[in-house]
């Protein structure tokens, strides 16, 4: 399994000035389906940690998948995928880093 740090930010302006409009209801329904999708991935062990930022409109999580193809499928099936800016960073381990440093030491 490979772990990736994923940071996602919505790339849309939300018309939330009037929360009782049908447009706001559609946006909230879309966001709810995205959070439900993330919760389902967490229950399956694909998301192993993370959650929404409390100070900005974004989420951060650690995705644990066996292949890059599965990661792509997860992103593609995300309800907010067309409106999401995503940063993905592969994660190593501290043990691997220490081993690499030992090999570099004289």
Region annotations inferred by a language model:
Residues 1-106:
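Conserved, structured core segments of small domains
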């Amino acid at each position: 399994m490979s772990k990736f740090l994923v940071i996602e930010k919505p790339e849309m302006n939300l018309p939330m000035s009037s929360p009782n409009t049908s447009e706001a209801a559609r946006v909230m329904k879309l966001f709810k389906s995205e959070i439900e999708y993330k919760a389902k991935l967490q229950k399956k062990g694909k998301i192993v940690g993370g959650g929404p930022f409390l100070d900005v409109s974004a989420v951060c999580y650690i995705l644990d998948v066996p292949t890059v193809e599965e990661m792509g499928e997860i992103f593609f099936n995300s309800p907010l995928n067309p409106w999401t800016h995503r940063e993905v960073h592969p994660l190593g381990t501290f043990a691997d880093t220490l081993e690499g440093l030992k090999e570099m030491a004289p």
